[in-house]
């Protein structure tokens, strides 16, 4: 592999760890003690801000109304119990994934399932932003000198969680279990101590620095509903366990249901306990210190023997709030992978990374959350208004889907199970309506607008993928049945240098009957190249000098347009490039060549063979040419590349496929045999789901003899605009990988999807 590309790979190994094989996926499954901190940290940690969120709203009616926070919290706790009971049934019915998207898709249809998916994706991003910002607030509440760095600290926390999650599910579980359990213990101690003091003597009184101003309004039904909606943020995170059933150890459904039960017990106890103490200690919302911090300081006052417990509570509140974001880092990538599998978003989201996690989903979630934190300056009170809409939309659709499931299947106990899910659907629907009405003008409108826009995008992506799949499948037979292909080769000549010598050798190898040499006189090119050309090549072919006024790309295209092109007529443009060093930046400096390659890529029947050569690293003169076609399957794009390979008439020509599993290897062997393409197929396994390493090892085995050069032909789908992001990520990776690989030349065989 090129030295220019080694440092990023080494850095990835340091931060992410050694890659794991697909066969190790079973080892990554989680027991309940590890699953709880991974999937339930969000719901458990919400005790740190849900009570305060309700109190901020109640403050609008004056200080005297803050006591209403306790009955509101009890109502939220009842709602949480209903939702968790409903989800315990859901995970038993859908043992691989009981998330809202799957349940709604199977029982309510495509549109409701996409509404649930879009709402959840938005909510997962908001969960990261709110949790991390709340965690940083817990620290700056204790160390007030840091309160000017909330945004920077929050962004750093997002980066840390991202790296940990890229290292794998099980490793993140071990990392996050310790602080999560210590938070639960410290909060139980704080709640127990506070309740004991209130029951046996006078309740301690909280001190509130920089309190928020109290309003003078009346405590009407609208304000009560708004406060209830804010407190309902305590329910966020419950969905993640249902989405992640397949991450549990077997029996998966049973273990997921047990984890939900533990979550209900812990979260309800802590939430109601904190609300009780917040009311009894007269804590009130502050611009600098959280309500939980005030309660902890009141229960463990400075100077007392237990004052150190205040710092324990603060430190682990910070830790669990930061780690609560991890719930989204489990849910978002899994949901994205399901959507990608159904072709509603880019297929890259289905790719497992080195550590058997959906790495693309992890990175996208981190980027979106970081952007929100930066825009809102890590202000929890501003972010919280965007919260909850998405999760309660998903709750409602999931529970409604389960009602339909029981009525449709009549499974065991359906007569009493359906009403449980029905009550859950009704309760969460009421909360969703309340949230939309009460928080619409404060930011919820953005979520309401974002969800339909996302759904439009989902349908657009699916239409594109379905059309491409149909075209590739239908076109495969026509490509295979095409008559024997012919090839015309053109070599672009800028100067007489070692890169040109390699290009001429390749042109003679793929067009022994002759080829054309074109020179476009441009600023910086060799003005005296024509008389020296004859002696350099021994007379043939003649150098054709084009009109330099058109520019390189237009002059070459004008010649290409004059040649026959089609399924059986190809034009190969060989482009020599001489570099001073193995640097990706050095290629970017060749703007004219890049523009030419980009223009030629959209021309039907035109193949660009890029021949990069590093000055001073030439090696032995090549003697043998081998052709290898990288194929993804039996489709029109791969078969066109095979047709082109046969037109080159190189004796040692083969197709190569890198399979991520033995099942995939068997499947492509069967497909290849049934379609009987004109060249043999070799299949190599890539157990780490990255074809880079296996591809390099395969090529190194061929080029171990320095007289051999391998021409790698790579099918590449060509489309326009934003659709480019839906294709060819692997092709771009291979281009970077092989750019400076010794004795390897890469040529793209385009398949146009421009309409």
Mark where each language-model region is.
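Extracellular loop-to-transmembrane helix junctions
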Residues: 55-105, 109-115, 130-157, 264-270
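Extracellular/periplasmic helix-exit of transmembrane alpha-helices
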Residues: 195-202, 258-295
């Amino acid at each position: 592999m090129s030295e220019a590309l080694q440092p990023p790979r080494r850095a990835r190994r340091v931060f992410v760890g050694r890659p794991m094989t697909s066969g190790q996926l079973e080892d990554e499954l989680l027991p309940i003690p590890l699953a709880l901190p991974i999937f339930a940290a969000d719901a458990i940690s919400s005790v740190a801000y849900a009570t305060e969120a309700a109190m901020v709203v109640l403050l609008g009616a004056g200080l005297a109304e803050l006591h209403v926070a306790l009955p509101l919290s009890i109502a939220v706790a009842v709602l949480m119990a209903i939702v968790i009971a409903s989800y315990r049934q859901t995970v038993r019915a859908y043992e691989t994934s009981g998330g809202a998207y799957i349940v709604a898709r199977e029982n309510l249809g495509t549109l409701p399932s996409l509404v649930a998916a879009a709402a959840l994706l938005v909510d997962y991003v908001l969960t990261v932003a709110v949790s991390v910002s709340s965690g940083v607030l817990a620290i700056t509440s204790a160390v007030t000198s840091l309160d000017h760095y909330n945004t920077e600290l929050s962004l750093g926390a997002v980066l840390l969680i991202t790296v940990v999650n890229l290292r794998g599910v099980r490793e993140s579980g071990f990392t996050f279990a310790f602080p999560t359990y210590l938070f639960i213990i410290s909060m139980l101690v704080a709640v127990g101590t506070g309740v004991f003091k209130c029951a046996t003597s006078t309740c301690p009184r909280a001190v509130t620095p920089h309190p928020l101003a109290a309003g003078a309004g009346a405590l009407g039904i609208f304000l009560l509903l708004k406060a209830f909606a804010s407190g309902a943020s305590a329910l966020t995170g419950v969905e993640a366990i249902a989405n992640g059933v397949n991450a549990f150890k077997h029996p998966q459904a049973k273990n997921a249901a047990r984890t939900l039960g533990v979550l209900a017990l812990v979260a309800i106890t802590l939430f109601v306990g904190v609300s009780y103490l917040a009311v009894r200690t007269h804590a009130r919302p502050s611009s600098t210190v959280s309500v939980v911090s005030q309660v902890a300081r009141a229960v463990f006052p400075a100077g007392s023997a237990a004052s150190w417990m205040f710092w324990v509570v603060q430190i682990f509140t910070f830790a669990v709030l930061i780690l609560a974001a991890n719930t989204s880092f489990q849910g978002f990538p899994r949901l994205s992978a399901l959507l990608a599998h159904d072709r509603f978003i880019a297929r890259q989201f289905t790719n497992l990374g080195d550590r058997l996690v959906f790495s693309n989903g992890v990175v996208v979630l981190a980027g979106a959350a970081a952007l929100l934190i930066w825009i809102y300056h890590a202000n929890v009170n501003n972010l919280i208004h965007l919260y909850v809409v998405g999760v309660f939309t998903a709750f409602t659709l999931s529970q409604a889907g389960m009602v339909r499931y029981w009525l449709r299947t009549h499974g065991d106990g359906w007569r009493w199970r359906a009403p449980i899910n029905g009550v859950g659907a009704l309760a969460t629907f009421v909360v969703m309506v309340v949230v939309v009405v009460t928080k619409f003008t404060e930011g919820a409108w953005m979520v309401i607008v974002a969800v339909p826009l996302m759904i439009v995008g989902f349908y657009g992506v699916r239409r594109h993928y379905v059309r491409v799949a149909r075209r590739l499948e239908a076109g495969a037979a026509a490509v295979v049945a095409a008559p024997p292909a012919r090839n015309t080769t053109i070599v672009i000549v800028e100067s007489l240098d070692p890169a040109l010598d390699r290009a001429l050798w390749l042109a003679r190898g793929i067009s022994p009957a002759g080829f054309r040499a074109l020179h476009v006189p441009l600023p910086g090119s060799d003005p005296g190249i024509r008389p020296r050309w004859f002696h350099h090549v021994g007379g043939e072919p003649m150098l054709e000098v084009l009109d330099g006024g058109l520019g390189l790309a237009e002059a070459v295209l004008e010649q290409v347009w004059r040649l026959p092109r089609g399924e059986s007529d190809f034009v190969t443009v060989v482009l020599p490039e001489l570099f001073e060093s193995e640097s990706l930046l050095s290629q970017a400096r060749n703007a004219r060549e890049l523009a030419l390659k980009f223009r030629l890529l959209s021309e039907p029947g035109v193949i660009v063979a890029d021949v990069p050569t590093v000055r001073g690293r030439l090696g032995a003169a090549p003697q043998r040419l081998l052709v290898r076609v990288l194929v993804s399957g039996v489709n029109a794009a791969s078969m066109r590349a095979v047709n082109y390979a046969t037109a080159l008439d190189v004796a040692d020509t083969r197709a190569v496929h890198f399979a991520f599993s033995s099942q995939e290897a068997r499947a492509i062997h069967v497909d290849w045999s049934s379609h009987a393409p004109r060249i043999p197929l070799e299949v190599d396994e890539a157990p780490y789901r990255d074809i880079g390493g296996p591809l390099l090892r395969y090529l190194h085995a061929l080029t171990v003899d320095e007289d051999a050069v391998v021409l790698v032909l790579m099918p590449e789908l060509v489309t326009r605009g934003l659709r480019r992001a839906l294709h060819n990520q692997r092709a771009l990776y291979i281009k970077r990988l092989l750019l400076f690989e010794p004795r390897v030349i890469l040529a793209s065989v385009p398949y146009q999807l421009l309409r």
